[in-house]
Structure formats: C-alpha cells, structure tokens
Amino acid sequence: METEYLQEMQKMPQSDRSLRSGKLIAVQGLVKCYGSVHAVGGVDFEVGPGRVLGLLGPNGAGKSTTLRMMLGLTKPTSGLATFDGVSYGDLPGHPMHHVGATLSSDTFAPRRTARQHLWAWAPVAGADKSRIDELLELVGLAKHARRPVGEFSLGMRQRLALATALLGDPGVLVLDEPANGLDPYGIFWLRRFLRQFADDGGTVVLSSHLLREVEQMVDDVVLINRGQVVWTAEMANLYGDGEWSVVLPADRHEAMTTLQSQGIKHQTFGRGLRVFALPGVVSSALRSVSPIPGQPLVLEGNLESLFLALTDQLGKELS
C-alpha cells in the first residue's frame, strides 16, 4: 500500500488549473466572545495571491473559530474578514467558485463512496460533474473512488475534503488542519500541491497545530495562542540569517552576557533568546547556564521552538 501511495504522489499532476484568480484576504480585528470567554481576542492579518499563510498554534488556540468567522459560519463579536474587499457571504454567484474550504474531515456520510460524495456536492459548488474524476485523480483517490468513505483513513478523508473544496475551481483555499492524519508522503504531496496552487496565482490560508510539519508549506506565519496573535513573520526573513537556535534560560541576562563574551550573535525573543549558531555550539557556550524549569535550555531553530519562547505552552500541547 505504501509503495502504491508513493507512486501516486510521484505522478501527481503539477496543477489543477494553469492560472488562479487569487484574492487579497484581509482579516481585521476579529473577536469572538462566548459570554465572558474570549475565544478569539483580536486577530489581524493579510495575505494575497501567490502566498500561503499559516495560522498556527496549539489545539484550542482559536484557529478554527477564526476560519469559521472568515467564512461567515460563526458571527464575530467584532471585526471583519474580506476577500478583495468583499465578505464571504457577499461574494457573487456561487461562493465556492471563489473560496474553497475544508473545516472538518468527519462530516462525510460513511456509506457514500468518494465519487458519490463529490457528486452530491457538485451542485452546491455550482460545479460541472465532469470535474469529479479529474479531482479524484488529482488528490490520489482515483483507485478508491468506489469505496465507502467510512472505510477511509483520516488522511484519505483529508484528501477527499480537499477535492470537495476544489470543486468550484476557486482561487482561494481556506483549510483547517489539512495536514492532520497525513503520513510523510501525504505531507509531501500537500506541500507540493499548495505551492503549485499559490504559484499559479492562488491564495491559501491554512491552520495547523503541527508546526514542524507545515513549516515548509507556508510563506507567512501567524502564531496564535489563547485567542491572541503572539507573532507574525515571513518565512524567508526567518531563515535568511542562516542556522540558529532558541535558548530558554532561567536568567536571560546571564545567558546574554555569556554569549556576548564569546562573540555569538543573539537577540531577545519572547522569554528566551534567538541565537545565530548551531545548537551544539550554543550548548557548549552555555554550559553553566540553567534553563527555565521544565524546559530544555537549547532548542533547534524552528517554529515550534519560537512558539515555546513566546508562550508558556509545553511542547506536548503542539503535537
């Protein structure tokens, strides 16, 4: 099965359409309160055609609620989200011609086959049913088109959800946890597909708690925790300075003084430091420095490490 799946990934079509009509997505001050609980406390970001933005953070951070507000499924307490200046509900014609979305891989009728599922959704999307076989081929499910969805793995349901989002041939994709349940080959396929979708002019917003798995998928990062945006960045800028590490010292001043005495470049970052050297070099330099209780002192430079420096979340909450 694994060999067959790898062959499907290797022969994946390079693009569903040669050109996309992506839109500028603007999220401005989105807030959602349930009584005294602030599920989302003011999220702002913009992303345009040719870009993939990752809304990243632990489970329960407010990512799904933010996406639902963008799509008009949850009414915000305040704020708005627009696609080229138009809210989702006011998009002309079939909204799925403009924006394709996946919000859950658990909403399939289990006795329907994959083809029957897309057949049922085609009229909703205003889509030609001739696209169904094309999309099943695209997401690697052509050989499983007649299998009941109830027999699908989580990864297969994720791919069927993506095919559903693509029915209307949209220029924008809004994907909630699309990497969840995918094996390494599926992650590789998704990364290639989203990159090609964006390169063809599409716009992508995806959410994930799997920071390491999606790090190579995104151009722009919005880290969210407990309903609040804690950091935004472009990935190109993040890795433009070469190798780096994250340090979580109990005494940041002590760590900074030690690094400075050895000529190691560093900068403050959240409750820790971003150090421009490999972890082994940094660990050797900081042998006498104690870590924040319950945390390692030196971490490999990646998004998950930065998140830990910005918050008091433990690593197990991100995986």
Question: Can you describe what each PLM-predicted range is?
Answer:
Residues 114, 235, 300-303:
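Structural motif detector for alpha-helix initiation sites
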Residues 91, 238, 306:
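Residues that scaffold the ATP/ADP-binding catalytic core of kinase and kinase-like folds
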